[in-house]
Amino acid sequence: MRRTILASLPLVLGFGVLLAALADAQAPPTWKQGQPSSMADSTLAPIPQPPAPKAAAEIPVDKIKVPPGFKVSLWASGINNARVMTWGEKGTLFVSSRTAGNVYAVVDKGGQREVKTIAKGLNLPNGLAFKDGVLYIAEIHRITKMVGIEDKLDAPPAMEVVYDILPRDLPHGWKYLAFGPDGKLYFNIGAPCNICIPPDTHANISRVNPDGTGFEYVAHGVRNSVGFDWHPVTKELYFATHARDWLGEDVPSDRFDVASKKGLHFGFPYCHQGDILDPEFGRGRSCSEFAPPLIKTGPHVAGNGVEFYTGSMFPAEYKNRVFLAQRGSWNRTQKSGFKVMMVTLRTGDVPKYEVFAEGWLQGDQIWGRPVYTRQMKDGSLLIADDYAGAIYRVTYQP
């Protein structure tokens, strides 16, 4: 009997491996999670990332429209999947490339930009922050740092681990990274799903000290925020949030929020856009339990970069306005987003929400996707485009 069982064991194990392989082959992609049967025939799918950045001559910068007095120019190109930008103290612009797994340094050489790869083979690096000569990099599973990098661009220093007690989930696992007014390092931990009750470790904005100690949660119920900034005067944390998919093409709206104090819950997965209970997880709950959105920014617009303008080049009324870069939708028949929006906060009144730059979407065709902004020392504004692999510069002259 024992011999028979042992002889049969390889067959059983082989059959189990075959079943597992078949199950994996038949499993839907993660972006389809939560799709109702009524939308099973939908042809909507994420927009594929181009295999290479566009050549400078192929980038139609003239199609980007901005208010009168403003001008857009191509500042740098050939940066595959250009995402988050942060300045070094000596004038180096560091740029992340999530899909390429690289981090770049862009150096201005007398009006010409030279791009150098300073880190490669990383795990979906997105967030970058710089302080006291140190570049901090956020991957899916860890935060690292490169000490003295601006003096070693041609021979980058080894990456040192700052914090690595992070989930490894790929869905919404990429992170934004920024230093707050308190000197702490803030980052997001997205929900590991389209819609689910996430573990307590997910769907939040968190912070640590620069040495990786003192981890704590700042905001809860945040499905996926990959961009935030602090008000220059009040020091309150403002952030953009991507809402769930497959509830409809026109709902729910993405959000622009303010964490006026630590510990607020912003509704995920129970309430969407502040007034829609989730049909599955919202039963027995009320949207009044959660912090409402400051602005409903639109369905599936995918707001990423959030930045308060503090420069002096733009007109005086632009001071302390917020630029919100929207990467754009994939799950709407009529595309939305693909713009840089502007938010004017008004005491005692609803914020003003308007277009600042648009043109990456032409009819139903896209040629670029604005994802993040970063001010220059002279007050001009850089816009990163991860689809074209380019960075644009917006200037103003009366």
Role assignments for model-derived ranges:
Residues 27-67, 174, 191-194, 208-213, ...:
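Beta-propeller domain segments
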Residues 74-79, 117-121, 162-169, 217-221, ...:
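Surface loop/turn motifs at the tips and blade-to-blade linkers of beta-strand repeat domains
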Residues 81, 99, 114, 121-124, ...:
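Beta-rich catalytic cores
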Residues 92-95, 134-137, 184-188, 236-240, ...:
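Conserved beta-propeller blade signature
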Residues 102-105, 142-144, 204-206, 255, ...:
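A short loop-to-beta-strand structural motif that recurs across blades of beta-propeller domains
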Residues 115, 124, 129, 141-180, ...:
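Asp-box/WD-like beta-propeller blade repeats and closely related beta-sheet repeat scaffolds
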Residues 374-398:
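Blade-level signature of beta-propeller repeat domains, shared across WD40, Kelch, NHL, RCC1
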